[in-house]
Amino acid sequence: EAGFIALHIVNAELDTNMSGMIKITTFMQEVIDIVKNYYNIVLNEDSLDFGRFITHLKYFSQRLFSNKSTKDTDFQLQRMIRENYSKDYGCAEKIKEYIKEKYNLNLTGEEMMFLTIHLKRISTN
C-alpha cells in the first residue's frame, strides 16, 4: 500500500505518466537501498532531512530522465564538499555508478555535490 501511495505522490507532484512514475519510484527506492547498504543504517523516514532527501530525489530523477541535468558552475565548492565529506561523497559515487550502469547516464559535479550534501544530512540523523 505504501508503494501505491508513493506512486500517486510522485505522479501528482511531477505530472508524469504511469510508466515515468514507475521508473522514478523504482529509481528512488533503489537509491534509498544503496544508501542504507552503504552506511549500514536504518534511515529515519520520519525526519525532516529524509523528507528533504526524498524531495531532492524526485526532482533529481525527473531532471536525470529528461536529460536536464544541472550545469557545473562552482568547482571550488564542489571540491570542498568532496574533500570535507569524503565518506558521503563515496556514497554519491556508488549512486553515480548505479545510474551509469543501469541507465547509461552521467552525473555532473554539481549533481554529485547536492547529492552529497543530502547524504551527509540523512546519514547523521
Region locations from a protein language model:
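A cross-family "folded-core" feature that marks the main globular domain of proteins
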Residues: E1-N125
